[in-house]
């Protein structure tokens, strides 16, 4: 590294690109592809207010500017260190000069008369490593929380199923959507297929994320809090089946061994009707399928490059079509889908707003968001994450990829909606 520092001003564009890749800012490779080392160290804040640099990151280039300052400092230190080699330095003045009454005649050791020079070691900071610590132990705890909520949800569904009134006694409630659209039998299968596609896309995207530990913690915390809320709403108010087409499994009337087998079957099938594991009734308010369709889209969009607009639109279409098919199949009341969408989007936005603003991670009289019941766990999971998590990607496997494109990191702009 030191040999390279000495020649930073003479770097070629290829060397600048290599430096950007090594320092985990590959998103600047394209806009700076023709920059030399001299061009790189001459960058200012004004340059990041103009295109194309203004489109790369929402921090106005502060991270890269900080790294350039560190690079210039290291280059400056190396230059002075070279000047002290063999006990003398290079000076651009005559051997004898007078300044403030002192003689500045150069001595053998290279130090002018009346002055003392020392080399000071300035540590090179590595803010990115400290700013986004992985903390896999916390991620494991979030996974345990997710596992608990998933199991608890299946238990709640089994309990609520016993309380659902027979459809012959309590017919479906009136619903404006059902009045306007006849039931389409295969629509719910389309919903579940769309959901599986979105989950699959999110898993692939997650594998390629650089900060997958932080992001997976957020996903586990949000999705399981949503399902915990769902357990409460579907238990306190048991709605009748939305349609006469429902064929609910027989009630068990306290047979806990059969309850356990039914719970294990539901867990094994992922809670999906398409796998034949979900034939219970009562889990209507609110829709778990809508939660997954909405949340996977939100995470896909939040942590993928902005330039992949077609990818965002594809996932949005899959999500919206899936929710429409839930209603078209008459498998949920409209209120189930509306409430699920509202709660999912608000919790996602609240959580990320709090995570992206350092001041909201500290409880105070003016921080009303600190009054939510999950604030303490939130502080525990997010306290060491400093700022917005970059949309950075890397190849996670030990074997090289044949045609590896440039890595991209994007941060959401302030005015993004």
Curated annotation (Swiss-Prot):
Membrane topology, as annotated: Multi-pass membrane protein
Subcellular location: Golgi apparatus membrane
Short name of any one Pfam family annotated for the protein: SAM_3
Cytoplasmic side: 329-417
Swiss-Prot/TrEMBL GO biological process terms: apoptotic process; ceramide biosynthetic process; inflammatory response; negative regulation of apoptotic process; sphingomyelin biosynthetic process
Superkingdom of origin: Eukaryota
Top-rank EC class of the record's enzyme: transferase
Cleavable signal peptide: none
GO cellular component: endoplasmic reticulum membrane; Golgi membrane; plasma membrane
Keyword vocabulary terms for this entry: Apoptosis, Golgi apparatus, Kinase, Lipid metabolism, Membrane, Sphingolipid metabolism, Transferase, Transmembrane, Transmembrane helix
EC number in record: 2.7.8.27
Molecular function, one GO term: kinase activity
Domain named SAM: residues: 11-74
Membrane-spanning intervals of the chain: 140-160, 188-208, 219-239, 280-300, 308-328
UniProt xrefs under PANTHER family: PHOSPHATIDYLCHOLINE:CERAMIDE CHOLINEPHOSPHOTRANSFERASE 1, SPHINGOMYELIN SYNTHETASE
Family the entry assigns: Belongs to the sphingomyelin synthase family.
Purpose: Major sphingomyelin synthase at the Golgi apparatus. Catalyzes the reversible transfer of phosphocholine moiety in sphingomyelin biosynthesis: in the forward reaction transfers phosphocholine head group of phosphatidylcholine (PC) on to ceramide (CER) to form ceramide phosphocholine (sphingomyelin, SM) and diacylglycerol (DAG) as by-product, and in the reverse reaction transfers phosphocholine from SM to DAG to form PC and CER. The direction of the reaction depends on the levels of CER and DAG in Golgi membranes.
Identification of the protein by name: Phosphatidylcholine:ceramide cholinephosphotransferase 1
Organism name: Gallus gallus (Chicken)
Gene: SGMS1
